[in-house]
Amino acid sequence: LLVLAENKELFQENGIEPMVSELPFIQACRDKRNTGTFLNSHDIRVPAPVDKYHPTFPLFAKPYDGSLSKDLYVVRGKEELTSEILNHPKLIFMEYIDKQEYKEFTVDMYYGKDNRVKAIVPRERIEIRAGEINKGFTRKNYLVRFLKERLDYLPGVVGCICIQLFY
């Protein structure tokens, strides 16, 4: 998406209209610290941050710029908080959301050129491979209304965006 957004004018000069969000939105979403701020600003709760030097357990750590489920850590106690995890320069630390208590969803949202959401498709994550859903259930549920109320209009957002949520 970043390459498409950076070259949007080049595409348009050649008669191609890429359905891609504006560059500032894409750049912000590439850093999970910004994504949390964005979601909070739209009344969507995110896991609480955890101070890695004064942690509460269990906690979850992941790279702020990560993808493909790489370098993800569930730390259940002090003995599991290794120096490798503590000193990893890109990890952010947050409260752990127990998948036994909450279901995890990937939600695809499609935005038109008017920056309004046109479709919201929640998929329950059953089996994951390399960070992507391998098995899932598409379910219309409360998330459709919840997200429509909060993210119906997003200036600069066009095409598909994807959000992972617990519900």
Language-model regions: role of each:
Residues I44, G156-V157:
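Helix N-cap/coil-helix junction residues
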Residues G159-I161:
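A structural supersecondary motif
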Residues L23-E101, Y111-R116, N141:
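Active-site nucleotide/adenylate-binding loops and adjacent lid/helix of ATP-dependent enzymes
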Residues L1-R30, R45-A48:
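A short, GP-enriched loop/loop-strand-helix hinge that lies immediately N-terminal to
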Residues M19, D65-S67, E127-A130:
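A short, flexible beta-alpha/helix-coil linker loop
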Residues R76-P155, Q164-Y167:
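Phosphate-binding site of ATP-dependent enzymes
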Residues E9, T37, E149:
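Surface-exposed charge patches
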